[in-house]
Amino acid sequence: MSKVVVLNDKLEKAGELDLPSKYAEVNPHNLYLYVKSYLASLRANTAHTKGRSDVSGGGKKPWRQKGRGGARAGSTRTNVWVGGAVAFGPTNERNYFQKVNKKQKRLALERALADKAAKGVLFTADSLAIESGKTKDANAVIKKLGVKDALIVKDLLDEKTLLAYRNLANCYVVDVTEVNAYLVSVFNAVIMEKSVLESITKEG
């Protein structure tokens, strides 16, 4: 059974919660498909090369077909010539979008959470707000839990908490609308507010 570590107000371990057993039964291929789709959506699609129809010049045959003793050539803009076209090169017309439906997104998130819970690095607390807005207080949270890096998921993201975590290279803070299977997967630990966890498990 996948367990969620429950933290008290002092961010000390106070107990455990069970994730729905079906989370661990989700086919990991759903997680793979979502991560693949997510990373594809980040591609800028700026690489572009010119094909035979794009390069200028080359309309005239450079030399006669026979009698010179050399290889025949019909244009100076084929891909074997300097200044010629590129064969099978990337173009900015390519669309990298990969469709993933809502059900697969939900299943991917469930599997990602189950994996973290199985490793004992899925935490939940009533509140994760940093009222001081200071980075040292945010860093103290991570040190206290003894994790390398963490994804912080709040129900409503306030400005002070965002400022507190923003300067930490090993942390990323989002609200419940932004959490996804990719973010859960790439961080060593995930810390959620209880309301967020309840919202996610209720949807599942």
From Swiss-Prot:
<dbReference type="GO" id="GO:0019843">
    <property type="term" value="F:rRNA binding"/>
</dbReference>
<protein>
    <recommendedName>
        <fullName>Large ribosomal subunit protein uL4</fullName>
    </recommendedName>
</protein>
<keyword id="KW-0689">Ribosomal protein</keyword>
<feature type="region of interest" description="Disordered">
    <location>
        <begin position="49"/>
        <end position="75"/>
    </location>
</feature>
<dbReference type="GO" id="GO:0006412">
    <property type="term" value="P:translation"/>
</dbReference>
<comment type="function">
    <text>One of the primary rRNA binding proteins, this protein initially binds near the 5'-end of the 23S rRNA. It is important during the early stages of 50S assembly. It makes multiple contacts with different domains of the 23S rRNA in the assembled 50S subunit and ribosome.</text>
</comment>
<dbReference type="InterPro" id="IPR002136">
    <property type="entry name" value="Ribosomal_uL4"/>
</dbReference>
<keyword id="KW-0699">rRNA-binding</keyword>
<keyword id="KW-0694">RNA-binding</keyword>
<comment type="subunit">
    <text>Part of the 50S ribosomal subunit.</text>
</comment>
<dbReference type="Pfam" id="PF00573">
    <property type="entry name" value="Ribosomal_L4"/>
</dbReference>
<comment type="similarity">
    <text>Belongs to the universal ribosomal protein uL4 family.</text>
</comment>
<dbReference type="GO" id="GO:0003735">
    <property type="term" value="F:structural constituent of ribosome"/>
</dbReference>
<keyword id="KW-0687">Ribonucleoprotein</keyword>
<dbReference type="GO" id="GO:1990904">
    <property type="term" value="C:ribonucleoprotein complex"/>
</dbReference>
<dbReference type="GO" id="GO:0005840">
    <property type="term" value="C:ribosome"/>
</dbReference>
<dbReference type="InterPro" id="IPR013005">
    <property type="entry name" value="Ribosomal_uL4-like"/>
</dbReference>
<comment type="function">
    <text>Forms part of the polypeptide exit tunnel.</text>
</comment>
<dbReference type="InterPro" id="IPR023574">
    <property type="entry name" value="Ribosomal_uL4_dom_sf"/>
</dbReference>
